[in-house]
Swiss-Prot record:
Signal peptide: none
Source species taxonomy: Bacteria, Pseudomonadati, Thermodesulfobacteriota, Desulfovibrionia, Desulfovibrionales
EC code(s) of this entry: 2.4.1.227
Tree of life domain: Bacteria
Binding site for UDP-N-acetyl-alpha-D-glucosamine: T12, G13, G14, N122, R164, S191, I245, Q290
Record has Transferase as a keyword: yes
Protein's UniProt name: UDP-N-acetylglucosamine--N-acetylmuramyl-(pentapeptide) pyrophosphoryl-undecaprenol N-acetylglucosamine transferase
Topology class, membrane: Peripheral membrane protein
Pfam families, A to Z: Glyco_tran_28_C, Glyco_transf_28
Any one annotated GO CC term: plasma membrane
Membrane-crossing residue ranges in chain numbering: none
Gene3D superfamilies: Glycogen Phosphorylase B
Compartments in which it is found: Cell membrane
Catalytic activity: di-trans,octa-cis-undecaprenyl diphospho-N-acetyl-alpha-D-muramoyl-L-alanyl-D-glutamyl-meso-2,6-diaminopimeloyl-D-alanyl-D-alanine + UDP-N-acetyl-alpha-D-glucosamine = di-trans,octa-cis-undecaprenyl diphospho-[N-acetyl-alpha-D-glucosaminyl-(1->4)]-N-acetyl-alpha-D-muramoyl-L-alanyl-D-glutamyl-meso-2,6-diaminopimeloyl-D-alanyl-D-alanine + UDP + H(+)
C-alpha cells in the first residue's frame, strides 16, 4: 500500500530544499503533494520534482509591524483553505519543514486528527516550529544542541538536516586539495541573494582578480543587474555571475572556498561536501539563528565567522586572499567540514515518517 504524504513549507530554499530531499526518498514509494505559500518561490522549486502543489494566501508575520494583523487574518483564511485541501487529498500524514507557510496545513491536520511531524533546520527554532512542536507527533532536529528547547523529549528525534542526493554524492568524491593550485571562490547569498555580500565582492574585484582568484557569483534576482555591471568593468574574465545557480553540486565541486550566509541548509551542505567557508550571517534573521548556525562550523575549525556589522572594520577581501595564500589552513578547514558532514539525514527522516505511520496503523 502506498502512503499519501503531504509536505508543507516555503519562503526560502533553506526550508524547501530539505523538504525536497526527503521527498526524493519517497520516489515511487508514496503519493506526495506539497502545500506552500502562493507568494513564495516554492511553487517553482517543486515543479521539477513533478509533485502537485497547492498554494495558500499566507505571508510571514514577524517584522511586518502594522501588517501583522492582516497577515494573521490571512492565516485564519489559510487554515480554512488548508482543511479543504486535506479533505481533497486525504493524506496519511502532514510533514512540515518550518516557515510561516507550514503553520496553516499543520494546524488543519491536527483539527482533522491527521498525524503530523515537523523538522527544524536551525540551531534556534523558528516561531512556527516552536508553536507547532506542541501539536506534532514527531519533532526532527538538525543538531542535538536544539534538544533542550523541546520539553517532550519522547517525540523528539535527532536526524540531521536533509540535503539533496546530488550533494550527498559529493561527500564520497571528496579530495584532499593540498596540491591544487586553483583559486576558485564561490559566492552565495542564499536563494534570495544578499546585497551586503554582493557589495563586498564587487568593491573588491580588483584585488581578487589581481590575486588570480576566479569567481562564481550567485547574486539573487533583484541584485543581478547591478553586480553584473560591476564585473563588466573588468572586461572578459573567467568569472561567472548569475542570479541563481541551478546545479549547486557542480558549483560546490568546482569551488575551493565559499563566501556565503549561514542558513541551516547551507551549513549542512558545506559540511557534507567538505568546503571551507567565510560566513556572514544575515543579521535580521529571526532570533539571530544564522549566527548560531555558523558557530557550529566555526567551533570545529571549518569556517571563519564575520558579523555583517563588522565588515567595514574587518577586511573580508583580505581574509579571502589570505586563505588562498595559506593552502594548509584551507585544506584543514575542508577536512574539518567533511568530518562533520551528516549525509543520512533524509533517510533518517523518511524512516521516522514510516515508523510513525506504521505505529498509527496498528492503533
Amino acid at each position: 500500500m502506498k502512503y499519501r504524504i503531504a509536505i508543507t513549507t516555503g519562503g526560502t530554499g533553506g526550508h524547501v530544499y530539505p523538504a525536497l530531499a526527503v521527498a526524493e526518498q519517497f520516489h515511487d514509494k508514496a503519493d506526495l503533494f506539497f502545500i506552500g505559500s502562493q507568494y513564495g518561490p516554492e511553487a517553482e522549486m517543486v515543479k521539477t520534482f513533478n509533485i502537485p502543489f497547492y498554494g495558500l494566501p499566507v505571508r510571514g508575520v514577524l517584522g511586518r509591524k502594522w501588517k501583522a494583523f492582516s497577515a494573521l487574518y490571512s492565516m485564519i483564511k489559510a487554515i480554512v483553505k488548508a482543511r479543504k485541501i486535506l479533505q481533497k487529498c486525504m493524506p496519511d500524514i502532514v510533514v512540515g519543514f518550518g516557515s510561516y507557510a507550514s503553520f496553516a496545513p499543520l494546524v488543519a491536520a491536527k483539527l482533522k486528527r491527521i498525524p503530523t511531524a515537523i523538522h527544524e533546520q536551525n540551531v534556534r527554532p523558528g516561531l512556527a516550529n516552536r508553536m507547532l512542536a506542541r501539536l506534532a507527533d514527531r519533532v526532527f532536529l538538525s543538531v542535538p544542541d536544539t534538544l533542550h528547547i523541546f520539553t517532550k523529549k519522547s517525540k523528539v528525534r535527532y536526524t540531521g538536516n536533509p540535503i539533496r542526493q546530488s550533494i550527498v554524492d559529493l561527500h564520497y568524491k571528496f579530495e584532499d586539495t593540498k596540491n591544487s593550485s586553483t583559486r576558485h571562490l564561490l559566492v552565495l547569498g542564499g536563494s534570495l541573494g544578499a546585497i551586503a555580500i554582493n557589495s563586498i565582492v564587487v568593491d573588491g574585484l580588483s584585488r581578487l582578480f589581481s590575486n588570480r582568484i576566479v569567481i562564481r557569483h550567485q547574486t539573487g534576482v533583484h541584485d543581478w543587474e547591478r553586480v553584473k555591471e560591476g564585473y563588466a568593468l573588468y572586461g572578459r574574465t573567467n568569472s561567472q555571475v548569475t542570479p541563481f545557480i541551478d546545479d549547486m553540486a557542480e558549483a560546490y565541486q568546482w569551488s575551493d572556498l565559499v563566501l556565503c550566509r549561514a542558513g541551516a541548509t547551507t551549513i549542512a551542505e558545506l559540511a557534507a561536501v567538505g568546503k571551507p567557508s567565510i560566513l556572514i550571517p544575515f543579521p535580521y534573521a529571526t532570533h539571530d539563528h544564522q549566527t548560531y548556525n555558523a558557530q557550529f562550523l566555526v567551533r570545529v575549525g571549518a569556517a571563519v565567522l564575520i558579523p555583517e556589522k563588522n565588515v567595514v572594520e574587518v577586511d573580508v577581501i583580505e581574509k579571502i586572499i589570505a586563505l588562498f595564500n595559506d593552502r594548509v589552513t584551507l585544506v584543514n578547514m575542508a577536512l574539518a567540514a567533511h568530518k562533520h558532514g551528516r549525509i543520512d539525514a533524509a533517510t533518517c527522516v523518511a524512516n521516522e515518517i514510516i515508523d510513525l505511520l506504521s505505529a498509527n496503523a496498528m492503533k
